[in-house]
Structure formats: C-alpha cells, structure tokens
Design a protein with these regions (language model features):
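Helix-to-loop junctions at the C-terminal end of transmembrane segments
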Residues: 58-71, 153, 251-263, 344-345
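C-terminal transmembrane helical hairpin of 12-TM major facilitator-type secondary transporters
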Residues: 262-309
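Helix-loop-helix hairpin linking two adjacent transmembrane segments in secondary transporters
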Residues: 126-127, 132-180
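Intracellular juxtamembrane helix-capping segments at the cytosolic ends
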Residues: 110-124, 302-317
C-alpha cells in the first residue's frame, strides 16, 4: 500500500474519531440548552431533526458539488459546519440561531461520514475490518465526549459548545491537509448504476434507515429521558452516552479483530433480535443499575449493524452507491427523533421513547428479508 493511501486511510480514522465527539455530543448539548432556555420537548425533537436534515442534504451535496467546485473544495466547505455550528450555539440562545447551528452540525456529520467511508474503504485491504475499525474510532470519540463536556461545564454552561467547536475546526484542518481524491471517488457516476436496480441494495438501505432511526433516537433522547423520569441522577445522566458508546467500541473492535463473521446476514438477524429484546427491557427499567446494564447490552447488540450492512453491499460499495445509500438511510434519523418529540409532547416521554421499538423491529425484518434474496 502506498504512503498516500495509508495517509488517507488514517486521516479517515482520525476524522471519524473527531466526528464521534462532535456528533454524539449533540444529544448532551440539546439537554444543556433545554435546561438553559427552557424550551419544550417538541423543540428538542426539532433541533435533533434539523441536524439529521443537514446530514441528509450533505450526502446529496457531496455527490453534486464536486462536479461544480471539485472534491477538495466540497469536503472543506461542508465539514466546516461542526466548528461553525457549535460556535454559534455557544454565543446565542435565539431559537433560529440554534436551529441553524444544529443544521450546520448535521451537514458536517453527513459530509464526514461520506468522505471517511470512501477514504477508508478505498484504501483498506480488508473492507469489513477497515469499516469496523473506522466505526470503532467513531465510538471512541463518542465514548469520550461526556468527559469533555463535564470538564468544560465547570467553566460555564456554554463552554462545552466552544470546546466542541475547537474539535470541529481540528477535523476541518485534517481534511484541509488530506488528499481528497481516491480511486473510488474518481469513478464516474455513469460507469455503473446497476446497484439502483438491486433489491439487495435497497433492502440494506432500509436496514440502515431503521438503524439510523433507532440509534439517533437513543443517543439524542436517552439523556433527557433518564433525567426526566428520575431513573438516573442529573449529574450522572450525561455519562449514559459513555456507557452506550463504550459497549459500541468493544463490540466493533471484537468484530474487527476477534470475531470472524462467516455469514453477515445471519449475524445481522441475531443483532436485530438482541436490539428488540434489550430495548424492551430498557423501557421497563426502573433502577439506575438495571437501566445502565440494559443500555450497555442494547448498544452492544446494535454496534455491528451499520458497518456490517455497509460491508455486505460488496461490489456495490462505491462513491456513487454511498452517495445514495447513506443519505437515504439517514432520513431515518430525521423522522424518528421528530416523532418521539411529538409523541412525548402529547402522551409523555415514556410513550415517546417506547415508539422507538418500531425501527428496532424494522432492523430484524430487513435483515431477514435481505438474507432470503438470491443475488
């Protein structure tokens, strides 16, 4: 492997680590902002959904803008959203400004995942291992984010947003010095669009839609849910993110280095069953210890779903296919947090969070369906 390929792959790992810090912190940040400004659950859901809308639009922009301004300029432009978004959150409490900030963070998140997926996938000898390591880096960043926020909170309520802005600008600088063009990113969209006619491709996209919906709802709402119900004390509730992403990191590293998955489709079915069982248990938990253990188990069960599903696309994994699969799947992260916010507003947060069992069931159904396909 050439030095430039190694540099691009490692830059993808590092950038995705920083993205884990910036993206997953949004669930804690929205809880902090809710306490500071006292807005309703509906606004919380709106902010999280705006972030997901930015994530979705970034995927499509990543496919369109390179033809106009070039790949490098596209990546540098879109990934600036982490630093800029969190910075304006730290300086203003106006709702429109906060909405813009979450949208910009979402744009950076979407552009980062698309870019890192190609940087790592195109420069890894073992695609499945590379994807799980990359997502493990993301989980490590997510694991550390509550500690960054807790330390920053000691200096003031708005300081966490400024610390996250600094992380965002570091990510942006990483892309500024990294060559953006890889073999996969140089492919012309007209070379092969056969994946658009593949039932397997759309089944995997549906699976990722449900995975995005379930995961984003938990990372975005769980802190608010635990604090609102008094299941976990306010000072400890932000560390539920650490529990979740600690489990995710362990599971992804095990898949990458220890567990050899012989049949990815059977593995995804087992993951889907685990997600349903543990999420149902999580919703029935009434004590701090039980809630933490079940959250760990739920995150562990879901951890391998995304990288395994993307790797299962096989020959269909390209710049063109990722430009459709990932943005389409990310719409699940728009819809479900918004639904939870609306349901919580009218029926209580318990019912709102319980509705997240629907995408959990969807993961199992799509996993079973894609296994039955003969392609």
């Amino acid at each position: 492997m050439e030095k430039e390929q190694i540099f691009q792959r490692n830059a993808g790992f590092f950038a995705f680590f920083l993205s884990g810090i910036c993206a997953i912190s949004s669930g804690v940040v929205v809880s902090i902002l809710q306490e500071i400004y006292g807005f309703a659950y509906g606004m919380t859901g709106t902010l999280l959904s705006l972030m997901s809308i930015g994530n979705l639009l970034a995927g499509f922009a990543s496919g369109m803008l390179p033809a106009k301004i070039g790949t490098k300029k596209t990546v540098v432009l879109l990934t600036a959203g982490y630093g800029a978004g969190y910075m304006i959150m730290g300086f203003s409490g106006w709702m429109l400004v906060l909405m813009l900030g979450f949208f910009m963070v979402g744009v950076a998140k979407g552009s980062t995942i698309n870019t890192c997926t190609i940087l790592v996938a195109d420069n890894s000898g073992d695609r499945t291992k590379g994807m799980n390591i990359m997502h493990g880096c993301y989980a490590l960043g997510a694991l550390l984010c509550p500690f960054f926020i807790a330390a920053a909170m000691k200096a003031g309520n708005t300081v966490p947003m400024l610390v996250l802005a600094a992380c965002g600008f570091l990510l942006w600088l990483t892309f500024c010095v990294t060559p953006a063009e890889t073999k996969a990113m140089k492919k012309d969209w007209n070379i092969d669009k056969s994946f658009l006619k593949s039932r397997k491709f759309w089944m995997l996209t549906g699976l990722l839609f449900c995975q995005n919906a379930a995961e984003t709802s938990v990372t975005g709402w769980m802190v608010t849910y635990f604090k609102g119900n008094g299941i976990i004390s306010g000072s400890l509730s932000p560390y539920t993110v650490t529990v979740m992403w600690g489990a995710t990191l362990i599971a992804r590293l095990l898949i990458a280095f220890v567990i050899h998955i012989k049949n990815s489709y059977s593995a995804m079915i087992k993951m889907g069953i685990g997600c349903i069982i543990f999420y149902m248990g999580l919703m029935m938990a009434s004590t701090q210890t039980t809630a933490i253990l079940l959250l760990f188990a739920f995150a562990f069960a879901m951890a391998g779903m995304n990288p395994t599903a993307v790797a299962s696309a096989g020959r269909m994994t390209s710049a063109a296919s990722m430009g459709i699969m990932l943005p389409a799947a990310s719409s699940g992260a728009i819809i479900m947090p918004w639904i939870i916010g609306i349901v919580s507003e009218y029926a209580g947060i318990e019912i709102g969070m319980a509705s997240n069992i629907i995408p959990c069931a969807g993961m199992l159904l799509f996993s079973a369906a894609v296994k039955r396909l003969k392609e």
